[in-house]
Amino acid sequence: DGVVWRTADTPENSAAFSRPAGRNGIGGYPQVRMVCLMELSSHLINASAFDSENVSEMRLAAQLAERTPDMSITLFDKGFYSLGLLHHWQMSGEKRHWLLPLKKNTQYEVVRKLGRGDELVKLKTSPQARKQWPALPEWFTARLLTRTV
């Protein structure tokens, strides 16, 4: 998950971190964006990445992929829906899986049904995503689990 903090208004922080633009120009304090990889049951932070607030959570999360254990499943919140990030995540090690809520209006093609509420699907990646994530293929295969809550 991600968080943004204000830092002390010092010349050092101003040089290192950006200030968000507001209606009246530049914001009051330099800000830091941080993304954490947290163990689910204990909420202990296993890894974190931080940078200026103008760096996206997706870019910071990508830095955490190499620090994720093999044979694991990572739960993302819906704000992390990026096929580039998800492909990078699973390709960064052995049997690295991910789970996140499906965004509304996500377009996919069913490859085959695996069971009730369980399908193998193909997701088409955009040219923009492939430009940002050079290893991203044109089509991305994923398992889609659907549940009624």
For each predicted feature, which ranges?
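Single, function-defining residue in the core of a domain
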Residues: 2-15, 21-149
